[in-house]
Amino acid sequence: MAALLSPSAMVLTYNERMKKIAIVIVVLLAFTMNAKAQIAEPKDIPQLEFAFQLKVTLGETYSCGETQHGQRIVIPITGGTFEGPNIKGTIVNGGADYQLANKAQNRTELEAIYSIKTDDGVYIHVRNRGIIYDGKDVNGNPSFYFKAAPQFEAPADSQYAWLNNALFLCTPDFSQQFKGIVLNIWKVK
């Protein structure tokens, strides 16, 4: 059928097609802009509630050397105390923070595994994973980031079972004079 059309008719057909394509693009852009404009601020914004503070005593740090994943650093956890509105006790000797340091990226992955014992004798297992980043932000300014997300395993039939059923965040508290590290634990509500 194209052979029957004159060259000027084919140009018109091409121009008409281009107009239709342009209209489709404009309509799609309008829908996209409208969809972005309709995105509302989420109503369920998580809140943080202070759960307790840990004062952790530490042993002598040692390195396992450079591994296939980075430099493995071990920091023994030798004890300490913790206290909050609904919980209080001691940190059991024998845990450790198994850090994986990547010096080229100024990044360290944390994985602390230890137990705590409440004042009424209940043992709770803790696994705290996090990140320390001591580099630069997107603008090239110095940036320090240290956050972790502890998970707790408390006896299901204890008054501490609430630790099993929530997410928690952990932040360091460098404002206190303490030989070791002070960590604040926050429950995500």
Indicate residue ranges for each PLM-predicted region.
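Beta-strand-enriched cores of mature, soluble protein domains
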Residues: 38-189
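Bacterial Sec-dependent N-terminal signal peptides
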Residues: 1-40
